[in-house]
């Protein structure tokens, strides 16, 4: 049976009927007797898309249903692979309500074809969310006898009525409709009764709305409508049939509408919005504002030929598609259509990078704005889009970016450059437009609100109004971004829309309860928007808020819930249906209520006037208990795409305030993956769910005590003083120079920012730390890592803020700021600040990672973080932003002080103090940075140790790796780490994670989550059977680092050890720069490990803190009083040369150090048994070699350079022991201050080693070289006629770098020590042999005590005669023992030399009075002691040279092996003569080179005897010395 509609209803307002699978369908079937038998006509033509049609093939119909999961799940089961069928359907379940039947074949799930998918894949797709969109193929459902209504599951429509307007031309007549029936309804009388009641209420509401619309109509029309709509109350009470019979148009409209909104099976969207949109546009409505008026506000069209669209009638989508296609073709057309642009912006913000489009739009506004107003906009465009760290940075050519930057800095107009930048991003924008067009062709345009554009018809007014409505949905999308991105996006959209003239209509006034609730929160919404400042009075706040609303169209939607329709979260089915069902309680609905479009639901679902926070429906499948269903939702729900509508938004606020036992899965999956706190506006919008969720302190922080709330009130942000001049009077500023004004500005900035930083620390304490501690949200250990010493840090900054306030109270002008700065950053205050700050900052990265983990795993902690970070005192900053404020503050201090120094007059005491304070700030920052780095490295080492697997190493037999079977990485300090590739052979490589520790290199192999310590082997060179095993752990004191000549990314680590043959590791970095970093750090670590082989040196007599030298007897001690402890004492060397101090400063330091405590004596046997590290030859340690010879116990494997260093040190110590009485400073009488002293050193070789141009006694320029009596000789110079071999050691550096490359000569003695000591000159005799006299003979000159030492009055010619002249080619000395003892007590009668004297005097200790010679046997004990020292040194030197010989032989074997293989395919076989020779030249010291050459000539000879090895190091002339050791 069919229903004939009256002629007053326009055909164009009708739509296809949705699927009726509820008790409503049962009730509708009873209406079959209401109409006459006039048949409706349908169009025979139909052109439907596959997803929209009902395909009938062999009795089967393809349809689409959308199922919403309820508390029992989806309510059906599936079976089969490839052909997946519905096996069973639960009666009354979600699937049955949606129209799923047993035996239906599933074609698509959520748009994905499943015809080739397995059973498990289909089930997984269906369970991927709370909604499932299924395309089914099955038998056609039974029909109901209602004509004009089509029950197609894929189509849901609502009959629309229009105001009375001139109708368009009628369409052609339609053929009779076909009748398609739906599934049988549920037989529930209560449900039918309830549905009938709802329809009656809707009918009354329609009458009232029509009466409101009728007055503007003509009198005749009004009488006609009243005649049709006058309903007798008695007739209404008698039953619905009579009312429906008299008013068929209204009843059918209600049937259409209620079939969608009241059907319990339609809690989820079961319709395709694309179909609704296109059907609605089949015949465009003329002259009606359909986009603004909801259904119940529109009148009835007086069209003379109303027709309803038949069930099989299709529509012509050409007009709308063509119009939209034209607009969506390029950006120029979009800019002129704001509504279409907002739809495109919704797509961009959901699916693409919004930066290029927003940059283009803002630049467009800039182009059309006058230069005065566009100046600030240009800076905003730079900060948002073009700066290096801009939140929405776009990629434009660097030249354009630099030009824009330059013009903005110079206050020039960058319009032309911005035009070019727009063209640069236009290509990417066009690609985004094409992407959107492709999605439109797939029917996805409705997801972004394109349905709302159907009735615009090119009307600019309606288009502008539609754009205003679309901005609401845009605001919801923006609210899901993080704050640092959402605020710039909001600003950019607001800028263009304001320029385009888009304004929002004033929303209707809310109810009293809403006003009362929203009033206290007004101020809390304002900080969400940029450049909104707090004002002092409430009137100003309200005025600014109103201005913001006018400027920012989005503010009306995201500010606070002004009206019920605006407070609805779009897309929430529960709210929409509940909203509609309770609408009858409002007697007079307002016609201006706006409709919000979600893009994924039919428009009519959203048309309502009010909202209620309760659910009172009790029908089958209703939303009763929906909150419990959502709370119990399991965590397997996968996150929906950002383009999808958030179905759970309205229930989110309730979930935020659940108990601690709520399931973690109830949280939004998106919030778990991206722990961004909700904004204040977003929290406010949720207040529609619970009236008590207003954004106030007692709700957000329910557990804070009253005193805490009082402290929070003290934390209100103070008004930021932008300009110091605004805080003082103009008369004060008028009397100051511009430089002083700038200085006061910087000082004021320091004060204000320090107070702001203190507020930030208090926020951390009150809102986070105190609550976490009171509520036991974190264990004490974790809390101690996150806030280790926060109260101490607050106290430090608070004390300084108080001091600054007192300083400010003294007057508006701060005259001298240096003393407070020094008081804060120097002395004990500096130590306290750097220690507390380092402790606070060290574990921040570890603690923040812990917080992220807890947020993912613990729902209670996640809720707390959301609440706390949403507090207004946090100023939209998250915990991770607040906790790093201390580190950021430390970096600001040097910059602020530098600016103050810049505006402070130089040369004043204040300037010097400020410079010192700045330097101390940098030291504090450096200290904290190092502490943070070490803590992070230690944390990473702990992680590596947990994953370390050394089982393979425990089973290995490699002796090198035996001691590392129980390796503990946490006991060492990590220097560097990173991935490297190990080329084991030509065809085998291995990816490694390499750790560089302070004494080890660890090669870790990744295997899943484990890190393996595993030995690897390869075939040895020259043998096909034997294999060489490589240890994964290398000691740094036994390795060499070399670069690979044929690969700029590779380097060698060569391990030399007594436990096995040399091993070569070829490691390849990712880039050449990485390789350089690795080599630099490795060489430095090798050098440090070589200085301290094995374990750290054990100091025999530890010096007091701060001392750099052993404590001496003071200025009264003489050289005769030297004891064993002084001879053998070693000290901890400095890491590097002190910067800045010259000779004078060094001498002063030594004089101060020399006043320390006496050094205790030790037995010589004990000294011989303890290992020694060679003292540094740098800086201050060079001058004590006569008193600090090194005893190195060769107990472990040593690097070759270490042996060479030690041997050379012994050579120097031996020379000084022999010749100490002849060195400068032991004169017969005291020299006058400032008088230059002649060089008394008898040999050129000694001069060349012990003097340098930068010594105090040598001014640095070359003296007259008429003979060899001068102390100073320029580096590298040599007397004429002198044999090079004689002084071969004279020009050798005392040590080498670990890389094997020899540096320029370094200081061999410490001038400061030389200037602070006293020395007798007659302890024993030294006989010099002159090998060649001027006449050609050989003679000898005996020097005995001080009588043979020439004084300063002797001429150079006399000295030349004694020493054999300048042509002497070599000298040799031997010791002649004195006959009697030497008096060891001399009393001082003078004062130490003045600093000026130190420049001219030699740096050796000087005697304050003339030496009084003593005869006899008084010096026998000293001589015997010195002889023992000499021979002990010679013995140690012999051992070291033997070891050096062995190292040289091992090195030669290593070079031979390198020549025999190509190093994993990178080093050619024939490259030994180049690379090996280069290594030989750079790695061997000159004495070792001579030994190597000698060994090469002798063939298989094992090496020279100890005497020969000693002679190599000691030989200074052509004649053997008398001090050469015996066997």
Curated annotation (Swiss-Prot):
Comp. bias intervals (Low complexity): 19-37, 656-672, 1312-1321
Biological process annotations from GO: G protein-coupled receptor signaling pathway; positive regulation of DNA-templated transcription; positive regulation of L-glutamate import across plasma membrane; Rho protein signal transduction
Record keywords, A-Z: Coiled coil, Cytoplasm, GTPase activation, Guanine-nucleotide releasing factor, Membrane, Phosphoprotein, Ubl conjugation
SMART domains: PDZ (SM00228), PH (SM00233), RGS (SM00315), RhoGEF (SM00325)
UniProt feature coiled coil, ranges: 461-487
PANTHER family with a match to the protein in the record: RHO GUANINE NUCLEOTIDE EXCHANGE FACTOR 11, RHO GUANINE NUCLEOTIDE EXCHANGE FACTOR 2, ISOFORM D
Subunit comment: Interacts with RHOA, GNA13 and SLC1A6. Interacts with GNA12, PLXNB1 and PLXNB2. Interacts (via DH domain) with GCSAM (via C-terminus). Found in a complex with ARHGEF11 and ARHGEF12; binding to ARHGEF11 and ARHGEF12 enhances CDC42 GEF activity of PLEKHG4B, and PLEKHG4B, in turn, inhibits ARHGEF11- and ARHGEF12-mediated RHOA activation.
Protein name in the entry: Rho guanine nucleotide exchange factor 11
């Amino acid at each position: 049976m069919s229903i004939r509609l009256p002629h007053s209803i326009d055909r164009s307002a009708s739509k296809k009927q949705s699927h009726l699978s509820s008790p409503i369908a049962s009730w509708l079937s009873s209406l079959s007797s209401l109409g006459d038998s006039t048949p409706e006509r349908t169009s025979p033509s139909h052109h439907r898309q596959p997803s929209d049609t009902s395909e009938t093939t062999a009795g089967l119909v393809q349809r689409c249903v959308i199922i919403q999961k309820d508390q029992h799940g989806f309510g059906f089961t599936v079976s089969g692979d490839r052909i997946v069928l519905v096996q069973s359907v639960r009666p009354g379940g979600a699937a049955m309500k949606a129209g799923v039947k047993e035996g239906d074949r599933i074609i698509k799930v959520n748009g994905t074809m499943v015809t080739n998918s397995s059973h498990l894949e289909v089930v997984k797709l269906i369970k991927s969310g709370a909604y499932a969109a299924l395309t089914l193929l099955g038998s056609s459902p039974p029909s109901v006898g209602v004509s004009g209504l089509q029950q197609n599951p894929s189509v849901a429509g609502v009959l629309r009525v229009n105001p009375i307007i001139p109708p368009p031309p009628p369409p052609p007549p339609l053929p009779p409709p076909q009748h398609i029936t739906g599934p049988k309804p549920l037989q529930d009388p209560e449900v039918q009764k309830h549905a009938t009641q709802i329809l009656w209420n809707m009918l009354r509401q329609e009458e009232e709305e029509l009466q409101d619309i009728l007055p503007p109509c003509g009198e005749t029309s009004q009488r006609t409508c009243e005649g049709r709509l006058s309903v007798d109350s008695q007739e209404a009470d008698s039953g619905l049939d009579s009312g429906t019979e008299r008013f068929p148009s209204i009843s059918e409209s209600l049937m259409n509408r209620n079939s969608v909104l009241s059907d319990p099976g339609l809690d989820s969207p079961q319709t395709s919005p694309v179909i609704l949109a296109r059907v609605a546009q089949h015949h465009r409505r003329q002259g009606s504002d359909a986009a603004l008026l909801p259904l119940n506000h529109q009148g009835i069209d007086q069209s003379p030929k109303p027709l309803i669209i038949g069930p099989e009638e299709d529509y012509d989508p050409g007009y709308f598609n063509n119009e939209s296609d034209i607009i969506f073709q390029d950006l120029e057309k979009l800019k002129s259509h704001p509504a279409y642009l907002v739809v495109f912006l919704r797509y961009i913000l959901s699916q693409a990078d919004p930066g290029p489009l927003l940059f283009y739009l803002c630049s467009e506004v800039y182009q059309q704005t006058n230069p005065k107003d566009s100046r600030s906009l240009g800076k905003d465009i730079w900060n948002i889009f073009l700066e290096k760290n801009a939140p929405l940075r776009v990629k434009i050519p660097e030249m354009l970016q630099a030009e824009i930057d330059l013009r903005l800095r110079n206050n020039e107009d960058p319009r032309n450059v911005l035009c070019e930048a727009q063209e640069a991003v236009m290509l990417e924008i066009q690609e985004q437009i094409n992407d959107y067009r492709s999605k439109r062709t797939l029917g996805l345009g409705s997801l972004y609100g394109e349905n709302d554009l159907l009735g615009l018809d090119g009307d600019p007014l309606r288009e502008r109004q539609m754009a205003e409505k679309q901005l609401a949905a845009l605001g919801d999308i923006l609210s899901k971004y993080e704050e640092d991105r959402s605020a710039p996006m909001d600003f950019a959209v607001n800028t263009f829309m304001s320029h385009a003239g888009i304004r929002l209509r004033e929303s209707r006034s809310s109810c009293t309860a809403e006003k009362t609730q929203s009033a206290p929160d007004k101020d809390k919404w304002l900080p969400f928007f940029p450049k909104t400042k707090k004002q002092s009075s409430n009137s100003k706040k309200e005025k600014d808020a109103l201005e913001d609303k006018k400027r920012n169209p989005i503010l009306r939607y995201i500010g606070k819930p002004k009206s019920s329709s605006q407070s609805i979260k779009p897309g929430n089915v529960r709210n929409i249906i509940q909203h509609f069902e309770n609408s009858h309680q409002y007697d007079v609905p307002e016609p201006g209520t706006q409709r919000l479009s979600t893009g994924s639901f039919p428009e009519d679902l959203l048309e309502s006037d009010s909202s209620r926070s309760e659910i009172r429906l009790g029908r089958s499948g209703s939303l009763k208990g929906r909150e419990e269903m959502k709370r119990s939702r399991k965590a397997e729900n996968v996150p929906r795409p950002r383009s999808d509508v958030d179905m759970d938004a309205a229930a989110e606020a309730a979930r935020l305030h659940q108990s601690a036992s709520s399931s973690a899965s109830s949280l939004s999956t998106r919030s778990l993956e991206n722990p961004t706190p909700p904004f204040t506006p977003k929290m406010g919008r949720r207040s529609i769910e619970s009236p008590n969720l207003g954004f106030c302190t007692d709700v957000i922080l329910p557990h804070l005590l009253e005193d805490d709330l009082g402290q929070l009130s003290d934390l209100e942000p103070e008004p930021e003083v932008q300009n110091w001049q605004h805080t003082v009077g103009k008369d004060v500023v008028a009397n100051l120079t511009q430089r002083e004004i700038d200085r006061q500005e910087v000082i004021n900035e320091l004060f204000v920012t320090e107070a702001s930083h203190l507020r930030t620390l208090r926020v951390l304490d009150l809102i986070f730390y105190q609550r976490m501690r009171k509520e036991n949200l974190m264990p004490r250990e974790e809390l101690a890592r996150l806030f280790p010493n926060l109260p101490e840090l607050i106290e430090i900054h608070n004390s300084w803020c108080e001091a600054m306030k007192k300083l400010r109270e003294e007057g508006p002008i701060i005259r001298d700021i240096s003393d407070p700065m020094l008081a804060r950053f120097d002395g004990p205050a500096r130590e306290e600040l750097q220690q507390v700050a380092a402790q606070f900052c060290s574990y921040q990265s570890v603690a923040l990672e812990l917080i992220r983990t807890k947020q993912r795993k613990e729902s209670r902690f996640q809720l707390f973080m959301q609440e706390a970070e949403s507090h207004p005192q946090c100023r939209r900053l998250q915990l991770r932003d607040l906790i790093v404020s201390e580190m950021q503050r430390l970096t600001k201090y040097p910059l602020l002080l530098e600016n103050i120094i810049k505006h402070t007059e130089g040369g004043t005491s204040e300037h010097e103090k400020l410079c010192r304070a700045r330097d101390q700030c940098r030291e504090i920052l450096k200290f904290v940075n190092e502490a943070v780095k070490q803590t992070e490295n230690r944390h990473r080492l702990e992680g590596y140790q947990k994953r370390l697997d050394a089982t393979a190493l425990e089973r290995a037999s490699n002796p090198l790796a035996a001691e590392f079977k129980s390796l503990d990485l946490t006991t060492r300090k990590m220097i560097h780490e990173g991935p490297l590739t190990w080329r084991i052979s030509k065809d085998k490589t291995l990816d490694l994670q390499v750790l560089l520790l302070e004494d080890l290199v660890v090669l870790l192999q990744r295997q899943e989550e484990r890190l393996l310590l595993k030995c690897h082997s390869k075939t040895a060179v020259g043998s096909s059977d034997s294999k060489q095993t490589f240890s994964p752990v290398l000691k740094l004191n036994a390795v060499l680092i070399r670069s690979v000549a044929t690969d700029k990314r590779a380097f060698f680590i060569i391990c030399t050890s007594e436990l096995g043959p040399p091993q070569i590791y070829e490691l390849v970095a990712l880039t050449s720069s990485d390789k350089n970093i690795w080599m630099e750090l490795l060489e430095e670590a090798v050098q440090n490990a070589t200085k301290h082989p094995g374990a750290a040196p054990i100091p025999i007599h530890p010096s007091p803190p701060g001392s750099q030298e052993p404590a001496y007897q003071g200025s009264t001690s003489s050289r005769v009083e030297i004891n064993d402890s002084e001879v053998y004492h070693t000290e901890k060397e400095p890491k590097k040369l002190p910067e800045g101090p010259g000779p004078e400063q060094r001498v002063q330091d030594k004089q101060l150090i020399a006043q320390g405590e006496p050094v205790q004596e030790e037995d010589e046997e004990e000294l011989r048994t303890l290992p020694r590290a060679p003292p540094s030859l740098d800086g201050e340690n060079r001058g004590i070699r006569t008193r600090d010879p090194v005893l190195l116990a060769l107990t472990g494997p040593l690097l070759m350079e270490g042996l060479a260093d030690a041997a050379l040190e012994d050579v120097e110590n031996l020379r000084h022991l022999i010749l100490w009485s002849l060195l400068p400073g032991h004169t017969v009488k005291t020299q006058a201050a400032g008088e230059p002293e002649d060089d008394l050193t008898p040999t050129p070789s000694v001069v060349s080693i012990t003097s340098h141009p930068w010594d105090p006694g040598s001014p640095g320029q070359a003296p007259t070289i008429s003979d060899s009596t001068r102390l100073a000789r320029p580096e590298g110079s040599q007397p004429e006629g002198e044999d090079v071999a004689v002084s071969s050691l004279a020009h050798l550096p005392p040590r080498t770098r670990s890389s094997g490359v020899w540096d320029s000569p370094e200081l061999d003695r410490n001038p400061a020590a030389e200037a602070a000591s006293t020395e007798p000159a007659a302890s024993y005799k030294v006989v010099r042999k002159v090998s060649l006299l001027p006449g050609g003979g050989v003679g000898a000159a005996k020097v005995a005590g001080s009588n043979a030492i020439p004084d300063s009055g002797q001429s150079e010619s006399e000295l030349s005669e004694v020493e054999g002249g300048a042509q002497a080619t070599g000298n040799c000395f031997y010791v002649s023992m004195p006959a009697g003892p030497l008096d060891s007590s001399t009393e001082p009668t003078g004062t130490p030399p003045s600093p000026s004297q130190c420049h001219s005097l030699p740096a050796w200790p000087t005697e304050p009075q003339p030496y009084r010679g003593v005869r006899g046997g008084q010096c026998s004990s000293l001589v015997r002691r010195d002889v023992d020292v000499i021979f002990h040194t010679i013995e140690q030197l012999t051992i070291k040279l033997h070891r050096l010989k062995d190292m040289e032989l091992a090195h030669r074997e290593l070079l031979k092996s390198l020549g025999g293989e190509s190093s994993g395919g990178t080093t050619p076989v024939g490259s030994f003569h180049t690379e090996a020779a280069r290594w030989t030249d750079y790695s061997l010291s000159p004495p070792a080179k001579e030994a190597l050459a000698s060994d090469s000539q002798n063939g298989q000879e094992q090496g020279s005897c100890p005497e020969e090895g000693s002679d190599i190091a000691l030989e200074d002339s052509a004649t053997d010395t008398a001090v050469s050791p015996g066997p």
